[in-house]
Amino acid sequence: MKVVVCGASGLIGTALRERLVERGHQVVQLVRREPSGPDQVRWDPARRRLDAGALEGVEAAVNLSGAGVGDQRWTPAYQREVLASRTEPTRTLAEALARLEPRPRVLVQGSAIGVYGHRGEEVLTESSAPGSTFLADVVLDWEAAARPAQDAGIRTAFARTGLVMAPGAGAFGRLLPLLRLGLGGPLGDGRQWWSWITLEDEVSALVHLLETDVDGPVDLTGPAPVRNAELTRALGRAFGRPTLLPVPRLALRAVVGGFADEILASQRVLPTVLQRSGFRFAHEDVDAAARWLADAA
């Protein structure tokens, strides 16, 4: 299958590209610089420029574009970038796919469980209502930007990804250096639910969405969400480091700004649609996930 991938140079995109090639798929990358090979196509999503003709023969697309929500302090300017870096590429790609004849069979569209906002003890699934936080609004706009592909009859699966357990990824990119120094501990009071997924399972789930008939929102999280304190203890056991020192809310805000509110948000998400579609996790519990992360780090 010929698959176009946006965001192929990011953490998840790189791993996905490698997995697709291993499975015998042909991968075309969308890049914003001069292409360095025949497997790359240049585009300019900020100006809505993408030659649909360059995508001739594409049967599927995966869109993972977007600035990392935890990469910088949440200034108003960076919040605008977080939104624009998602909606502009998504709309540009969706419109180009809709113009193709024949049209691709599927678009796997990046999304996030941030759509649910801060929900305390509530158990969340794909049928749960959205929240009212900044990230919830971003995700809703992000998913809406893919509508041209949906309206053209392209099966569209929204991969609502949870907290990806991988070296350098999001919240874990902040947590692991502290853990190695023996300074890792629960964030805030540690009672917030964290819906995690390992990078290995994240990539497998994305491939699964390409190769099955699932559409609509799909939560990409492990089957057993845990409280932050429990996850932190599991990491401590896997890395052989103490996890006794809690990280206060004020300290988090000093380092990451408004992103601290997202780190401390409680989201108890279950991957209902993913499991019903027959997906099998390599890492079903947090201890197995933590051991995998320690080996990968």
Model-predicted segments: where are they?
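N-terminal Rossmann NAD(P)H-binding glycine-rich loop of SDR-like oxidoreductase domains
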Residues: 3-23
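NAD(P)H-binding glycine-rich loop region in Rossmannoid oxidoreductase-like domains
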Residues: 35, 39-89
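Conserved Rossmann-fold NAD(P)-dependent oxidoreductase catalytic core, especially the SDR/UDP-sugar
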Residues: 81, 91-133
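Conserved beta-loop-beta element that borders a ligand/cofactor-binding pocket
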Residues: 111, 144-167
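Glycine/proline-rich active-site loop of Rossmann-fold NAD(P)-dependent oxidoreductases
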Residues: 140, 152-154, 165-174, 208-218
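Alpha-helical substrate-binding/gating segment
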Residues: 176-184, 192-226
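Mid/C-terminal beta-alpha module of Rossmann-like enzyme folds, strongest
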Residues: 211-258, 291-297
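C-terminal amphipathic/interface module of NAD(P)-dependent oxidoreductases
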Residues: 261-297
